[in-house]
Amino acid sequence: MSGLYTETREVLRKYGVRLRRSLGQNYLIDEVKRQRILEYADLREDDRVLEIGPGIGTLTLPMAELAGHVTAIESDPLIAAILMDRLQVDNVDVIVGDALRVDFPEFNKVVSNLPYQISSPITFRLLEHDFELAVLMYQKEFARRMVAEPGTREYSRLSVMVHFLAEVEIVDYLKPGCFFPRPRVESAVVTLKPTGFRAPAFLEDVCRALFQHRKKKTSKSLRESFHEIRTDLSFNEVLRGLPPEILEKRVFQLRPEDILEIAEHIEDLSGSS
């Protein structure tokens, strides 16, 4: 067994902790993978790092030695108390709370083994902020949807939104045995670099409407889910002026730029009505 596995078990035993999968408490125990994650993050003395779901400090402790400051947000008060007890440095702040609700401090990098049940909302919340780089662990299937291309089975609303908001790359995969306790799924390490793209007001609504019927033609999908688009325009008003080559495609065949064109079309009409 690895030293990190032994260390993790000893810490949990010392504090009498029983981990809960429902909270995404699967801790990294593979030393090689941990080192790779730190290398991808390329931490330096002037970096201010945000970590979500630090657990007992598997990443927090080595990051504190490399970065200028680390802020760790932990939702479980017991685990947060253990982390604070283990910290022997003064450049780490631990916030006890829900990462979807608490105010984020200033940061330029994010490094996290994310609780997988909040993967989507926390990713979009992070992308509302300006930062240099994120190195994040996700469930493998979620990561593949993030980078999926049009026409593939994994292509989704997530794929389209992330396409515009960040440069995304899957840089590593992790088997269940890399964690304790073992999750039921494989995982992936993903790097994100925000593009600074400002999405038009209707892009998210259009994506949501279209991908409710991803195998149908775009015109039919829009008709059936038009109520998802928060506009005073009618379906027929929107339909007019959209290129036939877009309307005839099935939703899963649409390029992100096609969907952006629909959203911008609605925005233009809304501004002129």
Swiss-Prot record:
Subcellular location: Cytoplasm
Superkingdom of origin: Archaea
Pfam families in UniProt: RrnaAD
EC number, UniProt record: 2.1.1.-
Main location group: cytoplasm
Stretch forming the signal peptide: none
Keyword Lipid metabolism: no
Single GO cellular component term: cytoplasm
SMART domains, sorted: rADc
Single annotated GO MF: RNA binding
InterPro entries associated with the record: KsgA/Erm, rRNA_Ade_diMease-like_C, rRNA_Ade_Mease_Trfase_CS, rRNA_Ade_methylase_Trfase_N, rRNA_adenine_dimethylase, SAM-dependent_MTases_sf
Role of this protein: Specifically dimethylates two adjacent adenosines in the loop of a conserved hairpin near the 3'-end of 16S rRNA in the 30S particle. May play a critical role in biogenesis of 30S subunits.
Protein name: Probable ribosomal RNA small subunit methyltransferase A
Origin species: Methanothermobacter thermautotrophicus (strain ATCC 29096 / DSM 1053 / JCM 10044 / NBRC 100330 / Delta H)
